[in-house]
């Protein structure tokens, strides 16, 4: 019957929209128009979230949840090459783009390299830019890992998603030109609103080692 044909075409159209990321389906609720995902460069250039979004004409605003000096745990000390218990600046921020919460990030830096950082307002300021202008600390390279994780109840509430919703966990260590680690951060991006771009290059075998230096 004509109705069945129309229904088949309609369903196929919805599937096509889902594949293109233009719609999303939730069990028990139906199909909705999806918000376009924010594109972020992951490996081709080392920029912070603020610089990345500001460069697209959408500068983020941060709600600073925690900003303090704490003793480094063994894990944080390992990333920053400090002794456990050494003082680090800890900053937790919920980052908004166009009024929507998109990223929950915890950042750790050696307190000795950036005195007074715990008192700086980062609501609408780039951390990387401030490190460069206030302390002469210019980040030269970084190492990032990416994985999918479910949102905890706390994370879901802050990011306005359901508990268990997929988040993209980005772990990063940033280094100065002399190889000293200056920042470790742990960022949770909303899976429904984030899209990362990766640029790959082909190199000769004897050049691979230099990329990991």
Language-model region placement:
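N-terminal helix-turn-helix
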Residues: 1-33
């Amino acid at each position: 019957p004509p109705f069945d044909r129309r229904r088949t075409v309609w369903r196929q159209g919805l599937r096509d929209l889902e594949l293109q990321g233009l719609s999303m389906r939730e069990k028990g609720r139906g199909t909705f128009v999806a918000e376009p995902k924010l594109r972020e460069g992951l490996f081709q250039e080392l920029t912070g979230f603020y610089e990345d979004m500001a460069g697209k004409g959408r500068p983020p605003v941060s709600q600073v949840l925690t900003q303090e000096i704490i003793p480094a745990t063994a894990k944080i000390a390992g990333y920053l090459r400090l002794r456990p218990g050494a003082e680090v600046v800890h900053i937790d921020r919920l980052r908004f783009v166009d009024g929507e919460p998109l990223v929950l990030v915890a950042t750790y830096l050696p307190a000795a390299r950036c005195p007074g950082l715990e008192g700086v307002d980062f609501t609408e300021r780039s951390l990387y830019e401030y490190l460069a202008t206030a302390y002469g600390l210019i980040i030269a390279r970084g190492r990032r890992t990416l994985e999918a994780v479910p949102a905890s109840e706390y994370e879901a509430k802050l990011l306005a998603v359901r508990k268990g919703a997929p988040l993209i966990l980005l772990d990063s260590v940033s280094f100065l030109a002399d190889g000293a680690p200056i920042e470790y951060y742990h960022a949770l991006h909303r899976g429904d609103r984030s899209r990362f771009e990766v640029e790959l290059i082909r190199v000769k075998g004897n050049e691979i080692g230099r990329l990991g230096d």
